[in-house]
Amino acid sequence: ALQSERKIEFDLIENVSHSVAIDRKLKSDIFIDQIGNKGGWGYGMNSVESLSMGVCTLTEMNDVYNSFIPDHPFINVNSENLDSELRILINNREKILAQGEAGKRWVEKKHDIKNVADILYNYYESIGLL
């Protein structure tokens, strides 16, 4: 409905090279990843990439993921609320930008190679592997 109302331009990114996919994500204001729990529990590399680019990212986070990662920057959507959540964002450019910035900071904190390496090193050290 939103596309036919000319409120959004929908770009399905699939069956293209990684470099083309990255370029198209970079041009997005909003990125929608997994809805319907078909690709996993909550988010995947597509979402990490879009967040790292500062793109507002929507995905379906189940209750387990929400409790495990309560500080995530995703806008949690499902098939029932996707349209209404998109309408909220479309009418609030500042929220889109704020979510994008929050996502970028979150990826730097949770997925940056140095931070992950430090966490793993400390864990391995604590269990006697190092």
Please report, for each region that a protein language model flagged, where it lies by residue:
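Nucleotide-sugar-dependent
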Residues: Q34-M45, T59-P73
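Flexible glycine/serine/alanine-rich "lid" or loop that lines and gates the nucleotide-sugar donor pocket
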Residues: L26, S52, I69
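A charged, aromatic-enriched C-terminal amphipathic alpha-helix characteristic of glycosyltransferases
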Residues: E94-E125
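Conserved active-site histidine-acidic residue motif and adjacent donor-binding/catalytic loop
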Residues: I13-L26, G42-Y43
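Conserved catalytic-core segment of nucleotide-activated headgroup transferases in glycan assembly
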Residues: A1-H18
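Short hydrophobic beta-strand element within catalytic cores of glycosyltransferases
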Residues: S52, C56-T59
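Hydrophobic acceptor-binding patch used for acceptor engagement in glycosyltransferases
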Residues: D29-Q34, C56
